[in-house]
Design a protein with these regions (language model features):
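ASCE P-loop NTPase motor core, strongest for the SF2 helicase catalytic module
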Residues: 1-143
Length: 143
């Protein structure tokens, strides 16, 4: 959160996607509200109908300008990857990054569909040693 506050203050800023376990989504939102209340955060999670309205909101120009951080779960990335692929991300953060087992895991396959832009930076957060070998993280599909 501090990184994004710094980047925003430095004028180096764009849409951020944070992919995290469902149980931590509320914590991400509340921590942004606590430490960087000027950064608007959108929690992307819910029923099919709720997600449909969230997707419509993301497509609106005004929402895209305001909601600079979108917090979602691994499951939502897999289910609605097309919605995330429609937007160019400045940063993609993967919380609990040890979930990225290899290039063939479902989450990695979904991330490949919309994290391919050379302008997108990626950040993996984990407290557990990664199971992915360095070659997978640095492969042409992930850079």
């Amino acid at each position: 959160i501090g990184l994004f506050a710094f980047l925003r203050e430095a004028g180096v800023w764009g849409p951020v996607l944070i992919v995290a376990p469902l149980s931590t989504l509320g914590n991400w939102v509340s921590e942004f509200q606590k430490w960087c209340p000027s950064i608007e955060v959108l929690k992307y999670h819910g029923t099919r109908e709720q997600r449909k309205s969230l997707r419509a909101a993301l497509e609106e120009e005004t929402t895209m300008m305001r909601a600079k951080v979108v917090v979602t779960s691994y499951e939502m990335v897999r289910m609605d990857s097309h919605a995330f692929a429609a937007r160019e991300w400045f940063y993609i953060v993967i919380d609990e990054g040890h979930r990225l087992k290899n290039n063939e895991c479902q989450l990695m396959q979904c991330l490949f569909t919309f994290a391919h832009s050379p302008n997108t930076s990626r950040l993996i957060l984990t407290g557990t040693p990664l199971q992915v070998c360095r070659a997978h993280l640095l492969s042409p599909r992930t850079t």
